[in-house]
UniProtKB/Swiss-Prot annotation:
Description of how the protein assembles with itself and partners: Homotetramer; dimer of dimers.
Annotated positions binding K(+): 44
Name of the molecule in the record: S-adenosylmethionine synthase
Primary site of residence: cytoplasm
GO CC annotations on file: cytoplasm
Pathway(s) of this molecule: Amino-acid biosynthesis; S-adenosyl-L-methionine biosynthesis; S-adenosyl-L-methionine from L-methionine: step 1/1
Gene: metK
């Protein structure tokens, strides 16, 4: 009997209050690492009507004008008029930063293995910045090895922002959310059940002032300018049975920080796999690479993606866990949900053999300290919106599949000939 079910994921635009905070936090990180790659950063941001608060702990030799960074980022996002309820030039910016705790720093500067002289390897000298668990995931539903629901939600959110910024739909304002419900049969996506877009907009559109007519205009424009282009190159498409919902409350004029306060780290499911995979709970934005919440989540994705790209599984989830001040993972767990071509225990052995999962090793392998300076002063702020994974537009080091050929060698000879990497 065919197993049929629905799965839903959401995304938000760069103008969503929480995403404003994520982007400001990572803009600060970019600026600090560009000048001082050894910066220790935990930058948290809060936004509300007319207010931006920067707080957290930073230890760095860099000289940064935080107020200027904030205003430039808010301008880039699109809040340039008081009519939006939040404006880059008029909002207040408060800065309340401390240095990193020396109790934490001592464990990160020199790892337990090195302090106790259990290992002399250079990569054992940087311990994890905190305890915690991190998950990475990959599946073969899309070319970028991401689940289809979150991939579609991100595509629509990016397109929604694009038609606003290019003035194709000039009545749109920066805040917006997208959501896609995908129909699955026997574990494979086969159709689209529901598409939902909530987008901030002006009270009137040209001479149209009636609320119902305004919403009808928005709905038609979004179908033509956003939904249809997003699905144009896909085999799974909406059909006559697909529900298309736009601003279901009736209107969305008040938005951004005026409508809701925002906070760094509140969109962790949007940042990752849209709920399709588990999440360890730690946010990414505003954290330097010694924070394993970020670097180990990137590494776990790298491991899972290479396993799927190698044809060793159709889907794969990797869990890593760390102790503060300890370089080596406390545990590694690999789960292929019954889709593995070889046993999960064998995959675990391959992960331990071929992947560097100590904080210093991950930082070095991906170049995490130097990516901002290597890419013109901005890197992390660009992954702070529209997902940290499955981003071919950004050439992310943890999205490489350079280990796939090596892993493929572990396939039984009867299977390896049927898989191409």
């Amino acid at each position: 009997m065919t197993q049929r079910y629905l799965f839903t994921s959401e995304s938000v635009t760069e103008g969503h209050p929480d995403k404003i905070c994520d982007q400001i936090s990572d803009t600060i990180l970019d600026a600090l690492l560009s000048q001082d790659p050894q910066s220790r950063v935990a930058a948290e941001v809060v936004v509300n009507t007319g207010l931006v608060l920067i707080t957290g702990e930073i230890t760095s030799q860099a000289q940064v004008n935080y107020v200027d960074l904030v205003r430039k980022k808010i301008t880039e996002i699109g809040y340039t008029s008081a009519e939006n309820g939040f404006c880059a030039t008029s909002c207040a910016v408060l800065v309340a930063l401390d240095e990193q705790s020396p109790d934490i720093a001592q464990g990160v500067n020199v790892a337990q293995e090195s302090r106790q002289q259990l290992s002399d390897e250079a990569l054992d000298r940087i311990g994890a910045g905190d305890q915690g668990i991190m998950f990475g995931f990959a599946c073969n539903e899309t070319p970028e090895f991401m689940p289809l629901p979150i991939s579609l939600a991100h595509r629509m959110a990016r397109k929604l922002a694009a038609v606003r910024k290019t003035h194709q739909l000039p009545y749109l304002r920066p805040d917006g959310k997208t959501q896609v419900t995908v129909i699955y049969e026997d574990g494979r996506p086969v159709g689209i059940d529901t598409i939902l877009i909530s987008t901030q907009h002006t009270p009137t559109i040209g001479e149209i002032s009636d609320e119902a007519e305004v919403q009808a205009k928005i709905k038609q424009d979004l179908w033509t300018m956003v939904v249809q282009p997003v699905f144009s190159d896909l085999t799974v498409k909406p059909d006559q049975n697909t529900r298309f919902l736009v601003n279901p409350t009736g209107k969305f004029v008040i938005g951004g920080p005026q409508g809701d306060s925002g906070l760094t780290g509140r969109k962790i499911i949007v940042d990752t796999y849209g709920g399709y995979s588990r999440h360890g709970g730690g946010a990414f934005s505003g954290k330097d690479p010694t924070k394993v919440d970020r670097s180990a989540a990137y590494a776990a994705r790298y491991v899972a993606k290479n396993i799927v790209a190698a044809g060793l599984a159709e889907k794969c989830e990797v869990q890593l866990s760390y102790a503060i001040g300890v370089a080596r993972p406390v545990s590694i767990f690999v789960d292929t949900f019954g889709t593995g071509k070889i046993a999960d225990e064998r995959l675990l052995e391959l992960v331990q053999q071929h992947f560097e999962l100590r904080p210093a090793g991950m930082i070095q392998s991906f170049g995490l300290r130097h990516l901002p300076s290597d890419r013109g002063g901005r890197f992390y702020q660009d992954v702070a919106a529209y997902g940290h994974f499955g981003r071919p537009d950004l050439e992310l080091p943890w999205e490489q599949t350079d280990k796939a050929a090596l892993l493929q060698e572990a396939l039984p000879k009867t299977l390896s000939g049927a898989v191409s990497v």
